[in-house]
Structures are given as C-alpha cells and as structure tokens.
Amino acid sequence: MRVMAPRTLILLLSGALALTETWAGSHSMRYFYTSVSRPGRGEPRFISVGYVDDTQFVRFDSDAASPRGEPRAPWVEQEGPEYWDRETQKYKRQAQTDRVNLRKLRGYYNQSEDGSHTLQSMYGCDLGPDGRLLRGYSQFAYDGKDYIALNEDLRSWTAADTAAQVTQRKWEAARVAEQERAYLEGLCVEWLRRYLENGKETLQRAEPPKTHVTHHPLSDHEATLRCWALGFYPAEITLTWQRDGEDQTQDTELVETRPAGDGTFQKWAAVVVPSGQEQRYTCHMQHEGLPEPLTLRWEPSSQPTIPIVGIVVGLAVLVVLAVLGAVVTAMMCRRKSSGGKGGSCSQAACSNSAQGSDESLITCKA
C-alpha cells in the first residue's frame, strides 16, 4: 500500500472565483483530524488543523477551555461569526463521531478497553496554476498505520488490511467515493480558490532563498560541501549537486525542508568531496522566487558563517510539527457535500456510527 502523507478541513461557500483566474505554481489545502482515546480520563481528545500550502489557518482542540474553531491566519479572520459557529459545530460533531469510531475499530482489531488508541485522517485538494483540481485526498489511519485511502482516480479505495476491507466493501456499496469526489471537485476547490484570493499577499508571495556554500573539513583527504537555502517561500525548492556537470544525487545528503519559524523555510544539501577538488562541484538551485536557476560554488576566500540561531529555531519548530504529526497521520469522518449553505456533512451523517455504519468514518466538512 502506498504511504499516506498527512495534511486538511472545509467550510461553506459564499461565492466562487472565476475559473480563468491563475496563480503562480500549484497550491494545496489540507485538513488533519486526530482523535486519541484515554481510558479512565473521559472522552477522546480531538484536534483539527487546516493548512493552505504551508500556512496553518485554522485549529480546533477539544481540550481547550472553550473549544472553538480558531483562526490561525489574518486572512481567515475576516470570515464572520456564522462561519466560525458552523466550523465549531462541525468539529464537535466530528469529535463525537470519532469517539464512536474508536470503539468500533477497537472491536475490529479485538483490542481491550485498557489501552489508548489513535484515529487520524487527512483530506484536501491540490490546484494547478489554472485553478483546476490536480489531485484530491481522503486518507485514514488507525494507531499510526494506514487503514484506508481514496485512490487518485477518486473512484476507488485501497484498504490496508482485512479490517479495512470490511469498511471498503461497505463504502463501495454505499457509493461513498462518489460523495468524496463531489466534495473534492467542488467545495474543496472553491474554498481553496477563495482562500488564495483573500490571502494572496501571503499565500501567493514568492521570497527567493538566501544562498551560500560552506566547507567543513573531515580529514586531510576529505571535506563536506554544504549548499544552503534560507528564508524562502513557498516551501517547494530543488537542490542538487553536480561534479563536472554530472548529477551526484546518489552521494548527496539532503535534509527535509524545514520551517524557519518566521513563515519562511530553509534547506541544505551536502556532499563529501576529495580535498583539493572542491571547485569541480557545483550546487544547483531552483525556486519560484528566483528569476532563473542558480549555480553556486564554494568560494575559499569568503567562508560564510552558518546562521546557527535561525537553524536552531527551525529545528525547534520542526520538532513541534513532528510531535503534532505523530498525533496526526490520517483517519476521520466525512460526508457528502450538500451544496447550498448546509456544508457537506449533516448531524445525522456524522452520527451514523451509532447504527454501526462504516460510512461515519467519512469526515465532516461543514
């Protein structure tokens, strides 16, 4: 089974942007739902976070003093009280549905009531530069392992094990994939367009990377060349090393793109080279904020100082996100889009699990 990549949420549509509008590059919206049971300590904790591209814009935590959908970006704060009331009710319904689903899944896997278990989901959509759907997602996981996922065709499911196959058969009989596809091709796309327009000064900006190459001797015979990209947005970037024009991907150490803590990102790629041959190696960088690809070499006369503070901040943020990611892999309850102002999941749909229907795993989107 393919690896599921977590990320996503959704709201009520008040107006669609024209299909002719274009944006630089592709954009994405992801919602992540996580429910963690805690036997003997009350109801499961439910957390939802939503992202547009690399920017978190909404959050809900059932453990908050007054649980509500909370804005996490200035451009979503302009949504009115009714919007936030709908979001809050949606999350509260989802929390209750997940409570039932956790109990059902525990039965599927013949687990006792003593241990803590985690139900996670991710859903959302990607748009191309023309504002049209590139890819839709609806993925679920249980206890950190894949459970079931909507395939790229948005018409079929991939189940991870025999328990998930039971869910798959029920969903196929109920034509759940059609409901998911209608949402992903409809409301998901429309809301992402809306957010991109409302937050265009932030979401559609392109900040080029600050670049340099550092040299780190390993011995008398070898050294590490590290190519740095700092302070860039959006997060998508390409770093490669070449030796005499030949790609060195197999020998390159490449870290994941990391948040810098200020809304930008950082990344580096390193290669070990024979001492004295450093000038044969070039770092090649491509990013939306660059007018053209960059080619960099180590300059022995100007060894730059590595900005340790910025790196430490980025690592700290990465750790926080990693912890959150461990609490968020991909499992939830969502229902079909109802059009108009009801959103895409009704109270009745979210409570189906009480009657034993696996349709309730489909996530609530409004």
From Swiss-Prot:
It is found in: Membrane. Residues 25-308 are extracellular. Residues 115-206 are annotated as: Alpha-2. SMART domains: IGc1 (SM00407). The keyword Disulfide bond applies. Residues 209-297 form the Ig-like C1-type domain. Involved in the presentation of foreign antigens to the immune system. Heterodimer of an alpha chain and a beta chain (beta-2-microglobulin). This is Class I histocompatibility antigen, Gogo-C*0203 alpha chain. It comes from Gorilla gorilla gorilla (Western lowland gorilla). The lineage of its organism: Eukaryota, Metazoa, Chordata, Craniata, Vertebrata.
